[in-house]
Amino acid sequence: MSEENVLIGVIGGSGLYQLDNLTVVKTVNPETPWGFPSSPITIAALPSGTKVAFLARHGIGHVIPPSSVPSTANIAALKSLGVSAILSFSAVGSLREEISPGSFALPSQIIDRTKGIRDSSFFNGTSIVAHAMFGDPFSNKLIRWLEPRVRKALEKEGKGKLLFTDKTIVCMEGPQFSTRAESVMYRQWGGDLINMSVLPEAKLAREAELSYALIAMATDYDSWRPHSDAVTAHDVVQTLHDNGASAKLVLSTILDDLHTTINTHHRALTNGNSQDLEAIREEEALLQERGSMKFSIMPASPQQKAEDRKKLAFILPEHFKDAA
């Protein structure tokens, strides 16, 4: 594991780290047992010294389609740098009239419409079985922490952009957009948003015991409106450009505060410092996923291969101490 004090990982477009108040410290490309990440990871620092790791989900220049994103390597690489919480930014289609293009959302639930093409578990292909809890696919405490701060940042921007919470996002396989029939069906299922990126990211973050939240940016109305043209990539890119500026403002507003909060929780959970423990009681601990895989992994047995335990120790050293 890296000695870098990088507690926050940001996954999104390659331009997200180009903030006025960020200085690039270094670029790293860690090799993991699942290969290399989508792109080299940029470690940047705020004037305060807070470091953040930025990863371009679709590669530099957006060259990797949704079904081919190496999400296992992406999450493992971020964890290897010391990351404890991931903020994932993604363009989404809106399945609700009130969530107009340009709006932001912090979803709380996912409907999985991927097709099994994507590797969705670190345990796949190993001799070790695990069943991670996924009833709440996003980190609820992190979302509650983010909500007032993201809302305040958008209000400060003054463009009238709204923030929605407690929404359900549908993750489709892609790369094609929905048919009109599918889009209408997703609305009937209770879907509010749709994208191609949140899975398997959220599942893998849970297995790696990382807090994970999706900051969704609505770019279009998908294809459910009967009298509107179906969504095109051109529509998405046009709105995404404006949303990108808003995303940068959100990041520059919250990163220092989030780093300080996570650092306090780390100290409290690691050292049991009474002052820090009191601080995280007052403001709920963000690192709720830490230790969550303890009872999800099947007990060690002679049938489990040593090389598999060593592989999984890369992301879960606490649970595979004999192999780390």
Swiss-Prot record:
Its EC number is 2.4.2.28. It is found in: Cytoplasm; Nucleus. The record marks 178, 233 as: Important for substrate specificity. Transmembrane segments: none annotated. GO terms for cellular component: cytosol; nucleus. Its main location: cytoplasm. It is an enzyme of class 2 (transferase). Pathway: Amino-acid biosynthesis; L-methionine biosynthesis via salvage pathway; S-methyl-5-thio-alpha-D-ribose 1-phosphate from S-methyl-5'-thioadenosine (phosphorylase route): step 1/1. GO terms for molecular function: S-methyl-5-thioadenosine phosphorylase activity. One of its GO terms (biological process) is purine ribonucleoside salvage. Belongs to the PNP/MTAP phosphorylase family. MTAP subfamily. Catalyzes the reversible phosphorylation of S-methyl-5'-thioadenosine (MTA) to adenine and 5-methylthioribose-1-phosphate. Involved in the breakdown of MTA, a major by-product of polyamine biosynthesis. Responsible for the first step in the methionine salvage pathway after MTA has been generated from S-adenosylmethionine. Has broad substrate specificity with 6-aminopurine nucleosides as preferred substrates. HAMAP family: MTAP. Homotrimer. This is S-methyl-5'-thioadenosine phosphorylase. It comes from Coprinopsis cinerea (strain Okayama-7 / 130 / ATCC MYA-4618 / FGSC 9003).
